[in-house]
């Protein structure tokens, strides 16, 4: 575990998408980042077992998860919270969400690490005279036993090995559908496997994207 100021986030969130996330979090007044190493992400672990574990040069199976807070605090402050200090409530109220960093680089674009399951607090619901309406899903995270909860819509970047853009879009759509219609949550590779039961011209993994028939087959 490491606690760093938000100003130092560029070494962890880089590339075009990482910079966008950093700008978004700056708008939310992010001040502190807690870096959780060796995080086991369920979605990535399933994708790892289905594809990466059998690759010639298999990557690490653990990810890195970044937790963002609007409150400024030190590592000592966090340790006190872990011991049940009253500062726990302050941490919960300042929680802005998390970003999972996969141990896989996107060498086709900018060489940055792929962004895994990410859930960040939305912008304020009002902006001057305008009212914003967001499609959200309850997102929970546990940091060394401390529970955090925000309402957001999780997303991640496409992973061309197991989940091209259509797969990732389907993965995002499952979150609200799981509440409305009790649709089971699947990992990106599981979505790809289910969708490509419709015969195609290419092998299932690595994924080369879906045809319209594949999208229809999934739903």
Predicted features and spans:
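An acidic intrinsically disordered interaction segment
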Residues: 114-142
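Active-site-proximal segments of catalytic enzyme domains
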Residues: 204-219
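Active-site nucleophile-adjacent alpha helix/oxyanion-hole segment immediately C-terminal to the catalytic cysteine
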Residues: 131-202
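Long, charge-dense tracts
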Residues: 1-119, 124
């Amino acid at each position: 575990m490491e606690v760093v100021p938000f100003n130092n986030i560029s070494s962890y969130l880089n590339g075009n998408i990482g910079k966008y996330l950093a700008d978004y979090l700056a708008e939310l007044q992010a001040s502190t980042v807690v870096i959780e190493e060796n995080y086991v992400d369920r979605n990535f672990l399933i994708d790892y077992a289905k594809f990466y574990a059998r690759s010639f040069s298999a990557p690490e199976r653990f990810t890195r998860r970044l937790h963002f807070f609007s409150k400024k605090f030190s590592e000592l402050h966090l340790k006190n919270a872990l011991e049940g200090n009253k500062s726990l409530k302050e941490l919960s109220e300042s929680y802005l969400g998390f970003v999972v960093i996969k141990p896989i680089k996107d060498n086709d674009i900018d060489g940055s690490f792929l962004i895994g399951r990410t859930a960040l607090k939305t912008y304020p619901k009002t902006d001057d005279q305008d009212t914003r309406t967001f499609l959200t899903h309850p997102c929970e995270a546990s940091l060394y036993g401390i529970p955090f909860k925000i309402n957001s819509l999780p997303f991640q970047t496409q992973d061309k090995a197991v989940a091209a853009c259509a797969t990732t879009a389907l993965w995002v759509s499952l979150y609200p559908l799981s509440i409305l219609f009790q649709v089971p949550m699947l990992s990106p590779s599981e979505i790809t496997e289910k969708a490509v039961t419709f015969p195609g011209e290419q092998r299932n993994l690595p994924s080369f994207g879906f045809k319209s028939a594949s999208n229809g087959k999934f739903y």
